[in-house]
Amino acid sequence: MGTVHARSLDPLPMNGPDFGSPDDADLVEVEPQKKQEILENKDVVVQRVHFEGLGRTKDDLVAHEIGQVFKAKNLIEVMRKSHEAREKLLRLGVFRNVEVLIDTCEGEDAVPNGLDVTFEVTELRRVTGSYNTMVGNNEGSMVLGLKLPNLFGRAEKMTFQFSYGTKETSYGLSFFKPQVGNFERNFSVNLYKVTGQFPWSSLRETDRGVSAEINFPIWKTSHTLKWEGVWRELGCLARTASFTIREESGHTLKSSLSHSMVIDSRNASILPKSGALLKINQELAGYTGGDVSFLKEDFELQLNRQLTWDSVLSTSLWGGMLVPIGDRPSSIADRFYLGGPTSVRGFSMYSIGPQSEGDYLGGEAYWAGGVHLYTPLPFRPGRGGFGDLFRTHFFLNAGNLCNLNYGEGPGAHLRRLAECIRWSYGAGLVLRLGNIARLELNYCIPMGVQSGDRICDGVQFGAGIRFL
């Protein structure tokens, strides 16, 4: 974290205003000089804000981020708002480092209680590279990236990324443009090619596409509007692929419009202790071109509550439905899949529901729910350090995946979704990898197994970001 320096000011008293939790205490450092007037509880005026180190960054971009500093009325507010402005500047992704210096005003126009705030910034290089690893849903990948940050001086960036994974290889070029003064409102365009292998379906899929999306907040919700055009090539992964998979092979062109809404009040995205998450997605394909037509809806709900002894009770519910439009049936590439260590544990990856000769075909409707209890490790080894990354995990999962006859009514649909419910229970260990991903090692007992389901009875390992 950066440091807020204040010159020509006496140190704050030990019983001064609260700066927040002890974890935030190192965010503010005061460098005093002796025999100066104490301004802590007196009104002050921020007369000038200076920037040192600006090169290609435009003035209007940074001016919007530091506007609140001028509204500060006392020293404490100046320091708080300066730190908040620093965080906003770093969020733009155009500076490597930002330091804040607070000093008394000097010069003919200086007033006795006037302050100058100086932001010392270091811009990123015009071209940066990166190498890292990424964890997906039970998949790992190596990612190489090349980025052109702050391309035109207003936080635009262009990124080229190549990813090589255990089941997927991709590369793409993207352009990102935020709205000046409102970083949450942004626009992006992407060109990409993705080749994936899906052994549970004996399927190989290659997507070549372009997409454009707009992100914007409304009150406490975040929204995304997206158009995507994809040329999809489906093929058999093995000679033993079923005849149904061979029928699905070939080329399709999908053009779709989608909208997603997210409400997230959780205190963390990985292993939260409190708060809730709601995601709702809609996708409409066919009305903007292409030879694939459908309406797709799905949602995700998660609730978390902290209990005694640092335990957390978490409940989650997923669901979705795909309705083909016209006479053409849905494609295997658009259907839902269920099962595996990240959804209904105790079953193999995406190995629940309709199948043909051992190849899983997905379904047009599904639901899945889970109840989880996370507790600290017994006897709390490594408490306050590495041991806090581990949690004991007890779970109960259930769900179903099927195809619906849309000539029937909603009552028949609900009855079909309530039939043949798969469920499982078990316990294990969870490891949190920062705020990026998590690993699970569980002992699972699958129940409600139906003919054709592939189970994982016993120890099951899972890695990913999104878990039921």
Curated annotation (Swiss-Prot):
Annotated ranges, domain POTRA: 44-124
Gene responsible for this protein: samm50-a
Any matching Pfam family: Omp85
Name of the featured protein: Sorting and assembly machinery component 50 homolog A
Classification lineage: Eukaryota, Metazoa, Chordata, Craniata, Vertebrata
GO BP terms, alphabetized: cristae formation; mitochondrial respiratory chain complex assembly; protein insertion into mitochondrial outer membrane
InterPro entries reported for this sequence: Bac_surfAg_D15 (IPR000184), D15-like (IPR039910), POTRA (IPR034746)
Cystine bridges: none
Cellular component terms (Gene Ontology): mitochondrial outer membrane
